[in-house]
């Protein structure tokens, strides 16, 4: 891999957004269409959730699989250069995600993580999107007391039960 000049690398990194990303905007539009009203980047809570639905006391994080290390995901690749730096960076991201989740649970706030991979699949597959949004609605409104951190686990269960 060709080594980049510090200025080039800095410019590349500056283009990586942390707020109002395309996946976040996609999820916000879906939630709005479903009738939910929410706060964006709600800084009054630990971890500043991407979306906070006050009525249901629910924090939603829209996580990139690469940066937040989505388990068993092909998007969560590991860079070949500067391995020590990346390993430390990723470990800290995951630790911080766990800490934030625990703090929110202590405050009796429901936490939902929506992964980049799931959003990609929703955009490609209308049937998947419908099922996903149904489970998301149930999670937000706490119809069931889910223990899984991940809606994709419930999607797998739902798909198996339909076969």
Task: Name what the model sees in each region.
Residues 1-113, 117-163:
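Nucleic-acid endo/exonuclease domains
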């Amino acid at each position: 891999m060709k080594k980049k000049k510090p200025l080039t690398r800095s410019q590349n990194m500056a283009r990586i957004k942390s707020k109002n990303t395309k996946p976040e905007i996609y999820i916000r539009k879906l939630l709005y269409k479903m009738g939910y009203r929410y706060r964006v980047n709600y800084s009054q809570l630990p971890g500043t959730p991407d979306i906070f639905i006050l009525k249901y006391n629910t924090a939603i994080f829209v996580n990139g699989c690469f940066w937040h290390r989505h388990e068993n995901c092909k998007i969560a690749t590991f860079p070949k250069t500067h391995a020590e730096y990346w390993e430390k960076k990723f470990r800290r991201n995951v630790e911080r995600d766990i800490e934030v989740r625990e703090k929110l649970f202590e405050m009796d706030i429901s936490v939902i993580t929506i992964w980049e991979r799931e959003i990609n699949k929703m955009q490609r597959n209308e049937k998947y999107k419908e099922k996903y949004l149904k489970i998301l609605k149930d999670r937000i409104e706490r119809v069931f007391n889910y223990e899984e951190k991940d809606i994709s686990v419930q999607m797998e269960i739902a798909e198996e039960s339909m076969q």
